[in-house]
Amino acid sequence: EIGNIPDRICRALAASAGLPSGTPGPVHINCEFRDPLVPEDSQSESACEAVEGKRRAGVSVYPMHFLRDPLSENILDPERATVVIAGQGAEEAVLEWAARSRVPVFAEPMVCGVPEDVRIPFQQTLLDDEEITGLFEQIIVTGRPTLSRPVQAVCASGKRVVVVASYGEWPDLHGSASCVVPSLQESDCVDEARQLPLLEALRERVKEVRAGIEERIASYGDTPSALGVMDIVWQLCPRIFLGASNPVRIADLIAHRHENASGPTQVWSNRGLAGIDGNTSTALGWASACARLEGADYSAVTAVMGDLTFLHDASGLGLPRGEEFPPLRVIVLDDSGGSIFESLEHGRTAPVEMYERYFGVSQRADISALGAAYGVKTRTISSLTQLREILTSPVEGLEILHLPISRPTKDIAHLRSL
């Protein structure tokens, strides 16, 4: 408990000083003191020494406008092989710095524009491999990489963590950050002699995983599967919305499996406690905003979500009279209920009947009839060939593509174990 004290109060103290945003704010800290409230003089020194010996050093937070002398201070430890872990909201300047410095980047699927030379795909698989995580000792975090457990585990593994964030609520779920800076400077450098072997080792591992993914997708032939559908969407669709359940995690497992392929230009997914709430409405709102801003140059949004996610916000399909749907395709991966918990402790330990009742909750809804009730064109897709043909044709208004599939639980477990 004593060791957690710096992590608990560090954010509050940083906010009171305006770090790293530059805007100080009021802070309220609730503290409870143990009896005796005033220790005897003879106890003071030993008590302080006990706390000092047990506590973990607090994080150093640098203000936004703090100018570091490039000759005297390097935030990074150049003696440590370094990687970047980029989550949703990653700062472009950090990705550009990584490309210049030959620092590998593990990125969530919502992070687009990572330079090909340093992008390392399949982060869930690679960062769950101790041989891989043993190759580097320093992590630079940008954005909010909270999608998968392997990423969080490596950030909490005792490696040196540098967070780049210009806002007060910087990402550091485990209190493991060594320092927080609003940006990286040219003086922040790493040792290229350490980085190049790391980059090459990661690329070799990526080749192995890529082959395993290709084999797994090919095993389904032309039959739609969660992996096969996501693979096609990633190849063909420039703007993708991912449902906040299995789809975003499957994208994290297979995105960029095609070497030297550019992939989508924009990817979005709702994050945080909202879960599957409002995914259909969010996709429609994003598509509508993009269509209004871009006009004739609009690149349609393709949304991919599970059946429960779709049904949970089905009323989002409602549209007032006199308004038109934006060009949007909603791909519904119908695996008869919720399957994300099958790959977690719930599915591994609960009896099948209990799991299906409380987590699977397969619905009796007719998705085609539901779409028709809202005046939305709905098609049931039975092959990947058919899906590919549709995705390469123009979309007019809102369209629902209903794909019955098997649950991807075993596929997800297989890809994570490659």
Language model features: what each stretch is:
Residues H28-V59, V161-E200:
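Terminal amphipathic helices with adjacent charged low-complexity linkers/tails
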Residues R203-Y298:
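Active-site diphosphate/adenylate-binding microenvironment
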Residues C31-L37, Q88-A90, M110, G168, ...:
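Glycine-rich beta-alpha junction loops
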Residues H28-N30, V83, I139, P238-G243:
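Short glycine-rich phosphate-binding loop at a beta-alpha junction
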Residues A255-L418:
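Thiamine diphosphate
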Residues E1, R119-D128, V164, S176-Q195, ...:
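Short acidic-hydrophobic, aromatic-tinged amphipathic segments that line or gate anion-handling sites
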Residues S21-D69, L387-L418:
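Glycine/aspartate-rich loop-and-adjacent alpha/beta segment that forms the canonical ThDP
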Residues P70-E73, T82-L173, R257-D297, L311-G318, ...:
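Glycine-rich, anion-gripping cofactor-binding loops and their flanking helix/strand elements
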